[in-house]
Amino acid sequence: MVLLLVILIPVLVSSAGTSAHYEMLGTCRMVCDPYGGTKAPSTAATPDRGLMQSLPTFIQGPKGEAGRPGKAGPRGPPGEPGPPGPVGPPGEKGEPGRQGLPGPPGAPGLNAAGAISAATYSTVPKIAFYAGLKRQHEGYEVLKFDDVVTNLGNHYDPTTGKFTCSIPGIYFFTYHVLMRGGDGTSMWADLCKNNQVRASAIAQDADQNYDYASNSVVLHLEPGDEVYIKLDGGKAHGGNNNKYSTFSGFIIYAD
């Protein structure tokens, strides 16, 4: 733009009677100081005092109403664990637990013998039997005492004549067998435990037709053991309800 002015206007004309003058285009003074060192009139240098005095004075008004609550901020980080709370009340009573294992044997008692308590009697199993012989037997066979009077626990079987143990312990057995004689022979009756003779008895026919063979035992039995009376020759009397021949037993105490 400056180059264009230099080419088109080579000379500037100055006018007399004015404080402004023109110089050659391109000089610094024309561009930077067109008024020739004189100050240009200014209309904004002096403020208007009347205008400033007419402006109103602002006074602080009363406090306004509280604004509406703002929205909830973001969730903060977890706090530190609090102190333990107070101990709560006891809970309800629980169900009974399972029965514990037996404890060790107690210390021996005093020298004086004490009486057997009623609790001891109640703990002994109820096992006892008593039966008579109705049918006659002879030779070598198991006597089947089929006239049963007592059979607590049902451990005696009249169809086989055998007592079968189900509770281990000490047992007592006794038997009385009436011999049927008259021909000069003798009779043997054995008490057996599992095919082993544990007691024997003999009745002989000398001057009378009848004689007894009797015996008793105390045995320790295990579950499954069998006890019975077996003839080992001769004849056993039977055939009525008088129970001349009998077999009985009971438990003394369990293991």
Swiss-Prot record:
User: Which is a GO BP term held by this UniProt record?
Assistant: regulation of synapse organization
| GO CC, one annotated term | synaptic cleft
Q: According to its UniProt record, where is this protein located? A: Secreted
* Start-end of Pro residues biased regions: 75-89
Say if the entry is tagged with keyword Signal.
yes
Q: Which UniProt keywords apply?
A: Collagen, Secreted, Signal
Q: Which residues form the C1q domain?
A: 122-255
Q: Which domain of life is it from?
A: Eukaryota
Induction remark: In adipocytes, up-regulated by rosiglitazone, an insulin-sensitizing drug.
Domain called Collagen-like: residue spans? 61-111
Which Pfam families is this protein grouped with? C1q (PF00386), Collagen (PF01391)
Mind telling me which InterPro entries this protein's record contains? C1q_dom, Cerebellin_Synaptic_Org, Collagen, Tumour_necrosis_fac-like_dom
Q: What is its main location?
A: secreted
The record's Gene3D superfamilies line, in alphabetical order, gives: 2.60.120.40
Q: Which GO terms describe its molecular function?
A: identical protein binding
Give, from the UniProt record, the effect of changing residue 28 to S.
Does not affect heterooligomerization with C1QL2
Q: Where is this region: Disordered?
A: 39-109
Oligomeric and partner information: Forms homooligomers. Interacts with ADGRB3. Forms heterooligomers with C1QL2 and C1QL4, when proteins are coexpressed; this interaction does not occur after secretion.
Name recorded for this polypeptide:
Complement C1q-like protein 3
At the highest ranks, the source species' classification is:
Eukaryota, Metazoa, Chordata, Craniata, Vertebrata
What's the encoding gene here? C1ql3
